[in-house]
Amino acid sequence: MAKKSKQMRAALEKVDSTKAYSVEEAVALIKETNFAKFDASVEVAYNLNIDVRKADQQIRGAMVLPNGTGKTQRVLVFARGAKAEEAKAAGADFVGEDDLVAKINGGWLDFDVVIATPDMMAIVGRLGRVLGPRNLMPNPKTGTVTMDVAKAVEESKGGKITYRADKAGNVQAIIGKVSFDADKLVENFKAFNDVMVKSKPSTAKGTYMTNVSITSTQGVGIKVDPSSL
C-alpha cells in the first residue's frame, strides 16, 4: 500500500487540481500519470445540472465508440428459434431461455451485456432484482430489447457502451484503455461528449455541464474544459 501511495502522490504532483485542462492535455496526463501494472481502463465522468426526478430530464442511452473500448464484451442473449440461431451466428457468447434464467438465479454472472427479443421479456423480468442493480437489464432505450439481435450483438462486441444519469445527475462511461493512442482516446471522448450535448433536456436550466473529468483505473482524476470538446 505504501508503494502505491507513493506512486499516487507522484501522479498527483503532476496534476493541477484547480485547472480544467483541454481534452488533449487531459488525455496526455492520463497516460503520463498511469501507474497500474495492467492495461487500465479510461473513464470519463460528467456532472449534469438536471433533475432526474422529472421524466423529461432523465438521460439514458447507448452509442458505439469510433475506436471501441478495448474490452472484449461477453454477450448473453435471450432468444428462441431463428433469433437464437441469429444471435449465435453474430457471435453471442451465451444464448438461451429459461435455462439461463435458472443459471443466473443460481448466482452465475459471467457476462457483460444482456440482449433480449421482446417476446422474451416476460421471463427476463424475473431477473429484475439481479440484473437491475447491475445495470444489465435489457431496455429498448439502449437497443438491448430488439428483434435485430445480430446488429445488437455485433455492436456490443464492437465498442458499444451504455450510459445513464444517476440520481445526482452523474454520468460515467469507459472510453478506452490507457494503451490506446492519445488521438483515439480524444476521438472517443469527443464522440461521447457530442452525445451528452445532444442529450440535454430542453427543460434543463442553468449551466448544463457543471463538471467534466477523466481518470484511469487506480489513477488520478483530471478536470476537463468542456469547451475543448
Curated annotation (Swiss-Prot):
Pfam families: Ribosomal_L1. Coiled coil: none annotated. The keyword Repressor applies. One of its GO terms (molecular function) is rRNA binding. It comes from the Bacteria. PANTHER family: 54S RIBOSOMAL PROTEIN L1, MITOCHONDRIAL, LARGE RIBOSOMAL SUBUNIT PROTEIN UL1M. Binds directly to 23S rRNA. The L1 stalk is quite mobile in the ribosome, and is involved in E site tRNA release. Protein L1 is also a translational repressor protein, it controls the translation of the L11 operon by binding to its mRNA. Belongs to the universal ribosomal protein uL1 family. This is Large ribosomal subunit protein uL1. Part of the 50S ribosomal subunit. Keywords: Repressor, Ribonucleoprotein, Ribosomal protein, RNA-binding, rRNA-binding, Translation regulation, tRNA-binding. One of its GO terms (cellular component) is large ribosomal subunit. HAMAP family: Ribosomal_uL1_B. One of its GO terms (biological process) is translation.
